[in-house]
Design a protein with these regions (language model features):
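Membrane-interfacial and juxtamembrane segments of integral membrane proteins
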Residues: 1-150
């Protein structure tokens, strides 16, 4: 399965993907941080610029998740760890759901709180959903094996 296709979900696997979700987020965060660092350098923004650089990185992070999840149902981090975002009914995560998930990432990840709100919500909900998932009616599940697509 390639990054640029929507894999078929394995519904009912949301309980066993929590650590993969964390790993996928770490991968995605590193990708955005590296890209943001390069962009900051290219735009000659000073890291000491504080809030401007942080705002740019937050915007990049939100756009990254919105574009990848809305287009492919997964980010590169989720892809590498065999995960996909779908609706509770097993339908593809579209741009509407991706926008809701991305917007609520700000609360799930409260700056400086290391995603503690999202992690607590994931552990307290039956379908292992963070606030963005609950609002968008989505779940993160394992992707089907190679060759199976939505």
């Amino acid at each position: 399965m390639t990054l640029f296709e929507r894999p078929k979900p394995q519904m009912g696997t949301q309980d066993d993907v929590v650590l993969r979700r964390v790993g996928g987020f770490v991968i995605d965060f590193v990708v955005v941080a590296v890209f943001g660092g390069l962009l900051t350098g290219a735009l000659s923004l000073s890291p000491e610029g504080g809030s401007g650089v942080l705002a740019l990185l937050l915007l990049l992070l939100l756009l990254y998740f919105f574009v990848f999840e809305g287009t492919y149902g997964k980010t590169p981090g989720k892809h590498l760890l065999g995960l996909v975002v779908v609706t509770q009914r097993g339908e593809p995560c579209e741009y509407r759901e991706a926008a809701i998930r991305s917007a609520l990432r700000v609360i799930d990840g409260l700056p400086g709180a290391l995603y503690i709100v999202g992690l607590i919500t994931i552990y307290l909900t039956d379908d292992r959903q963070r606030l963005g998932d609950l609002a968008a009616d989505t779940v993160v599940v394992r992707a089907a094996e190679r060759g199976e697509r939505l």
